[in-house]
Amino acid sequence: ALPISSSHTVGPMRASNRFIAELIDANLLDRVSRIHVDLYGSLAATGAGHGTMSAALKGLCGFVPETICIADAEAMMQRNSVDGTLPLAGYPSQAYTGGAPGSEDGKVYGPVLSYREAEMTLRPLTVLPRHTNGMKITAFAGEQILAERTYFSIGGGFVVEGDEEATGGASLSNPPYPFGSGAELLQLANDAGLSIAELKMANECSVRSEQEVRAGILGIRQVMKECIGSSLSRVGYLPGPLKVRCRAGAWHRDLMAEDPEKSAEFATDWVNLIALAVNEENAFGGRVVTAPTNGASGIIPAVLHYAMNYTPGIRHCGQAAREDAVVKFFLAAASIGALYKKRASISGAEVGCQGE
């Protein structure tokens, strides 16, 4: 996932990339001569601090949160800041310098336009009816409007268009164990003799194989580990004018010297360290997992770290058993998190950062 904020950074990137995909599907991309982005409500009011405008440009250039190469994206933004270059759907290769659309390796690339963050229209006092995080993207051919879409970033990186119903990932339209509340979840699990994780796995297997579910979960876990490792190796100051010093790396070195065996006495210190490390990596613009949001993305890795290192029966298990524990952990967490998303909110704009 992209750094900083799930609703203000990940969502806008997804929305603008989705807009480009719709242009490609409609065979309109090569006709675009100009593009414009309007930001509304909270996206406009706090967009500068969350990297909203930059994220929208990156999405227009073909970057997506799941696979974004931070170095490539920043190189593109650096060039944009110098000459305004905006390659719709990205560059076919490093050597590509033309302005004409084309394709390479089966991927479609659009025209290279000129458009900067400063040209976006910010409307912080205008809140669209559906959600406070609204954005409109318009593509022009000369003065003619080719396409215009309004998107809403509803929290957790999820994006909807207009009156579209909110969904995330593959839709579990006919799961064997549908539930809409905690009480229903517990009752279904008890009646079926299943744990919450087992019930959730059965539901997930209605749209993908168990092997695919496991691979996806373990892939997410690997990204979390890489995020933590990257943060613990950083030194210096966090980005921004306040000159906040990085703390996770130094704290990790001190804690390793004081508690090399990870004794129970220091469990809370390790949990807090992992959460801080993820948050600092997010502030640096590194890759984090939006679970449930970027602002709260340190909690799941921190709790999982505790589970893997301090839970009896897991700490000294073999690799296969530890992977099973990770899968169960994520399935149970997803079941509970889905209820928060459905029955309340995971959007900081709606429930605040503590709500996340």
Task: Name each region found by the language model.
Residues D30-C69, M76-D83, A321-E356:
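A structural-propensity feature for long, helix-poor, extended segments
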Residues L28-D30, V127-H131, E280-N282:
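Solvent-exposed alpha-helices and their adjacent loops that cap or buttress functional pockets
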Residues S7-I24, P301-R315:
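Alpha-helical support elements that line or immediately flank enzyme active sites
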Residues G11-A15, T52, A296-I300, E356:
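Catalytic-loop motifs flanking and including active-site residues across diverse enzymes
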Residues G59, V64-D259:
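C-terminal regulatory domains involved in ligand/effector binding and gene-expression control
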Residues V207-A349:
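Accessory "access/gating" subregions that flank catalytic or transport cores
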